[in-house]
Regions:
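Conserved SAM/SAH cofactor-binding pocket of Class I
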Residues: 1-42
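Short alpha-helix immediately C-terminal to the canonical SAM-binding loop
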Residues: 18-19, 68, 95
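Short helix-capping segments at alpha-helix termini
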Residues: 27-32, 77-79, 106-107
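A short acidic, Gly/Pro-enriched loop at the edge of an enzyme's catalytic core
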Residues: 43-58
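Active-site capping/gating segments
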Residues: 90-124
Length: 124
């Protein structure tokens, strides 16, 4: 939102993430009228998908490799054409496995980040 988006919808499986998202937005001067944060599983909850209001432009997953591998094929249909899937929290010993799973799910890894034994991938 600070980079120009008009609005945002965020969903996290962890209810604590909702409160943290609201706190972080407030610290950055972003009013609640510009975004919605929900707890739940957008992959299995049709009501959350409806509230999302269409495909996502950005999906972020900062979580362990096994979850990213399982999530990759399921999240693809929820994304708009050209959308970004940003994955992080990938330990170096699993990076190639995760990259392979992303590519097998139809993603193209456009950028790779590496820091202190951890990887991130920016995919489309």
């Amino acid at each position: 939102l600070l980079l120009g988006a008009v609005s945002a919808f965020a969903c996290d499986i962890d209810e604590k993430a909702v409160d943290i998202a609201y706190e972080n937005a407030a610290l950055n001067g972003v009013g609640r009228d510009r975004y919605t944060v929900r707890a739940g599983d957008v992959l299995s909850d049709p009501a959350l998908r409806r509230e999302m209001g269409g495909g996502a432009d950005i999906v972020a997953a900062n979580i362990v490799s096994d979850v990213i591998i399982a999530l990759a094929p399921a999240v693809r249909p929820l994304m708009n054409p050209g959308a970004i899937f940003l994955c992080s929290g990938i330990i170096d010993s699993r990076a190639e496995e995760v990259r392979g799973a992303l590519e097998a799910s139809g993603f193209t890894v456009e950028e790779t980040g590496r820091s202190e034994g951890w990887f991130s991938f920016l995919c489309r």
